[in-house]
Amino acid sequence: MLGLIHGGVSLSNDEIDVFREKFKKRVMFEIKEADNYPPEARQAWCSGIPGIAEAFAYVLDATGGLSDHDQEMLVKLFREFQHDLDLINGPADVSLCHGIAGSLAAWYRIACLLPDLHLSDDIRFEAEKLRQR
């Protein structure tokens, strides 16, 4: 996959490792930026943590897999998502781009990469809580 970006030339393991480290640093920067947003924006798929987390999970999975540390970070971000959902008062935007539906969909796709962690059950629980609002 990454070789296509470089004109069809395969990357060495060292080059992939360098890419992964740079990518992780960029993700951490983006997450710190998103931490300054209000909960609605912080948890939007298009500009917030769920979209960043989804890119993080799938790029790392495609370039060597998710380490235990990566998985722990994703779970931590999901727990923050749950906390932020509780902070959103009143009707919630449920659109796919910048609303809760897109965020839940992103977390569900991430959960597919982490089947042993059973995040799907938590996601369904959050969706049900929102439905009952």
Question: Where does each model-flagged region fall?
Answer:
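Glycan-recognition and catalytic cores of secretory/periplasmic carbohydrate-active enzymes
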Residues: 1-133
